[in-house]
Amino acid sequence: MSPWSMPKASSRTLATGAAKAIGEVLPGLKGKLDGIAVRAPVMDGSLVDLVCRVKRTVTKDEVNAAMKAAADGPMKGILEYCTDPIVSCDIIGNPASSVFDSLSTSVMQGDMVKVLSWYDNEWGFSNRVVDALMKLA
């Protein structure tokens, strides 16, 4: 998570520096792991923290390009691609089901990918219900 996104949440800040502190407390782990800690509960803003192993070696830029292509193409209106620092309060009222946080993408050892995506767990879902009803009408 970008340090520039931290102040935007003001009294509702959710991100912590716990992952960075691990390398300071256990120097043998410095540079060997990465992560994020998120405080809960949150209001409507929610975060998906997804880590997966992929079949081939990839870069951060390749992962972000694939997500951008999906957001601009077949997932337009459902997936939003974000290039700005973002926190939970930024997505309140956003109709997208997923706001991909491109600044937080990381790739470890070439095949372990970590992505973050935010969503308004009330409004985003409501918009998908309306989409489904419109298809049925």
PLM region spans:
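Short, hydrophobic alpha-helical segments
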Residues: 54, 133-137
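C-terminal substrate-binding/catalytic lobe of Rossmann-fold NAD(P)-dependent oxidoreductases
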Residues: 1-112
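Glycine-rich phosphate/pyrophosphate-binding beta-alpha loops
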Residues: 39, 118-125
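Short intrinsically disordered coil segments
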Residues: 68, 131-132
